[in-house]
Amino acid sequence: MAKQVVIKIEEGSFELGFPVSLEFLQDGRIIARERKCPQLPPNPDFPRVYDQWRNIYTGLGNIYTESFPDFRVIETQEGQITHVSSLEDCQNATLTLESNVRNWFGQPIFGAITARIIGELKDGTPNESVRVIVDTSNDYLRKLSWDYWDLFEKPYFLPQAEFALLSQYDRPTKKLKQSIKILAIFGSDEGGLQLQQDRELIENLNKYGARITSIPARGNSLTPQELFDSLWLGNWDIIFYAGHSSGQTIHVDHALNLSIDLLREALRRNAPRVKLAIFNSCDGLGIAEYLADFNIPHLIVMREPVPDLVARRFLKYFLEEFTQGKPLHTSVREARKHIFMIHLPTLRVI
């Protein structure tokens, strides 16, 4: 039986705190609600500390070019001030951010919320998989490293728990049929992205019985018409995109950026059939927010830029777990664990 806990965070602020309520679901059906939860405590320093870390982290891209020849980065706007960061600066900023987040999660209110969640799930088996969904429209809360919370870190609480983000949830996930249909979309490889290796990872799934359509054909550039037609005509279980993105824009080729809103009608037609969308690109929260309106059950995005090698390794580890029949959120958790073993400043951005 699939269990979910939805932590609904209402409008608030880091200065005053955030109202919160809980919903418990089993097999897509709400079985309990908890509306009298303690309010999340204030954390007025978090936006500043996060922005400082993010500026240093993205500025580190020039250094990582030596080790990782391609970096899925957010494009700099004209007139924007940028700085080249050192690895030490990034490590220090990461420690400051981690300390801020751990101190926040260490406040008694989070212990009280944990107790209510554990109390509601006390009849579950110790190794039962539980999906904990954080439902918020606040950008900073979406980017916060929720896996620092004891609810996820302490194995004696929910050892098989995995957090997810979303702004809407209605449609329970249907089990994927044995022969799944995958649309693999490959955008711009500007900056030296090794999209050919992403393509090989996806197309290798045919050995598990998946039916894969890749666009564009090898050696060609993606066009908006090809993208629209493929989304419109297909009956896809999984949509996969690899390339660059920023906000709600994907980079079709070196000279063309395409607003995902131009694909609205094609998405409206086929999104009800889609079980999973994966965007192996930087700055994916804008795309995730847009696609949430189409009620796709599962979206995997990068919350911040990551080196291309790391994005590809995450994809590899995730697909290895997922194709063995493990639940999606369990596959994401295991892939994250693999990635955290790579000694980079911080990779809690997927």
Feature annotation, model-predicted:
Residues Y148, E153-T173, T249, L256-P272, ...:
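Caspase-like cysteine protease fold
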Residues N127-R131, K177-S179, N235-W236, P272-V274:
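A general structural motif
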Residues S137, R171-N257, Y290:
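A domain-level signal for caspase-like cysteine endopeptidase catalytic cores
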Residues E162-L165, I238-Y317:
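Catalytic cores of nucleophile-dependent amide-cleaving enzymes
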Residues M1-W146, F152-K154:
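Non-catalytic, solvent-exposed interaction/assembly segments
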Residues F314-K326:
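Active-site proximal helix-loop segment of RNase H-like, two-metal nucleases, encompassing DDE(D)
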Residues V130-T136, P216, I278-N280:
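Extended hydrophobic secondary-structure segments that form protein cores and membrane-embedded regions
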